[in-house]
Regions:
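Extracellular and secretory-pathway beta-repeat/beta-biased strand scaffolds
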Residues: 1-384
Length: 384
């Protein structure tokens, strides 16, 4: 099926919107900034098992839910799938304000690609799950957002998605990634509920979230919820010659970096910045968050090191009640030149440094870095 659009913005109301396994829907739009808002008014969720192609941007709104099956292939300049209402007036006024209490979920098991240099992918609902592939690798301006809440605002500047604002709500919000989210040096935002009121929000990552780049510096990854559990990988590495690591923020009340967790913001010419539980400025432009409890389990890895040259980066792990360090934390200087970085492990309450913990701020051809320990009560179960 071909949908031909001649205007920059168009609204299509559907009784149902589904794409079968062998079907393809083509949106033929004037340019990459043209947008089609597809609003489903019927009582059933949208099931996308086939292909959607667009040279512009595609928005699917269905309060009953939007599911992309394992065979789904979506390729557009930008993609939004949501169960929240998006009014015609806001759409025409270029205001991306999504709100409402739709009970449906947004689930991706297929492949969604944003191919434009300023392209983005946004999955917005009370419950968002990615079990497939979300890819936006055209430019460092790309952003992928998986956000759960009752009112969500996407903030743009010069047609680029710059951040997300989630208003306070009381719903049980869940965002989960089980497969792959990939931006090439861009930004990934994974948030459940507002940073102002983190209650009832859960983020779980057992997959791989990548904001690394082979050409540019590492990008930015934000995980924000009341309860954040990472058993997978968060990677914002600068892999190319002369590049530096990016920034990774894990913000919430209760944070667990499980034994299989790997968080890395390494760079060829300098380490990046990793904040776990510490007061960090996150991408949703909301107040800084400090965790109550942070646990870094045995064999978990947190690294902001320089690889070849340059200084190690900064790793900050902080809580107000208890911080437990049992894993491996590194902010090493480059192998050829550069100094070690800074690791700060702290708590207003209790800081536990377990027997399996390792903290590395070494420099082969420079000065060693600094490991700062700050706590109301310090418990050390290892040789220092």
């Amino acid at each position: 099926m071909n949908i031909n659009q001649t205007s920059q913005r168009a609204v299509v109301n559907w009784q149902s919107f589904d794409v079968g396994a062998n079907a393809q829907v083509n949106f033929n739009q004037p340019n990459a900034q043209a947008v089609t808002l597809n609003r489903v008014t019927g009582a059933s969720a949208s099931q996308i098992d086939g292909a959607i192609r667009a040279n512009g941007q595609v928005i699917i709104v269905n309060s009953n839910g939007v599911s992309f099956g394992k065979g789904a292939q979506v390729d557009a300049a930008a993609v939004v799938a949501t169960t929240m209402n998006f009014s015609n007036q806001d759409f025409m006024d270029f205001k991306h304000v999504y709100q409402g209490n739709g009970t449906g979920k947004v689930v991706n098991e297929g492949r969604i690609t944003a191919h434009d240099p300023k392209g983005f992918i946004a999955l917005l609902a009370p419950e968002v799950r990615n079990e497939g592939y979300l890819v936006a690798r055209a430019n460092v301006a790309n952003t992928i957002a998986m956000v759960a809440g009752e009112k969500i605002t996407l903030n743009f500047q010069n047609n680029q998605l710059m951040g997300v604002r989630v208003d306070v709500s009381t719903i049980n919000a869940l965002v989960e990634n089980k497969r792959l989210v990939f931006v090439d040096g861009g930004t990934v935002i994974v948030a459940a509920n507002s940073a102002r009121q983190l209650m009832n929000g859960v983020v779980r990552n057992s997959g791989v979230i990548v904001a690394s780049s082979a050409v540019n510096n590492g990008g930015k990854i934000d995980l924000i919820a009341a309860d954040v559990t990472n058993t997978g990988k968060l990677l914002a590495n600068g892999k190319g010659t002369g590049t530096t690591g990016g920034q990774i923020n894990v913000a919430g009340e209760n944070i667990t970096l499980a034994a299989s967790s790997k968080i890395a913001a390494n760079g060829d010419a300098g380490g990046g910045q990793i904040n776990v539980g510490s007061k960090a400025a996150v991408s949703n432009n909301e107040p800084a968050i400090t965790a109550k409890n942070v646990r870094v389990e045995s064999t978990a890895v947190v690294s902001a090191s320089a690889i070849n040259s340059g200084n190690g980066g900064t790793v900050k792990i902080h809580s107000t009640e208890q911080t437990q360090i049992h894993g491996v934390i590194s902010a090493n200087g480059g192998a050829v030149s550069g100094n070690g970085g800074v690791v700060q492990t702290s708590s207003n309450g209790t800081l536990v440094v377990g027997s399996t913990s390792q903290v590395n701020v070494a420099a082969t051809n420079g000065q060693s870095g600094t490991w700062k320990l700050q706590a109301g009560q310090l418990n050390i179960d290892r040789n220092m």
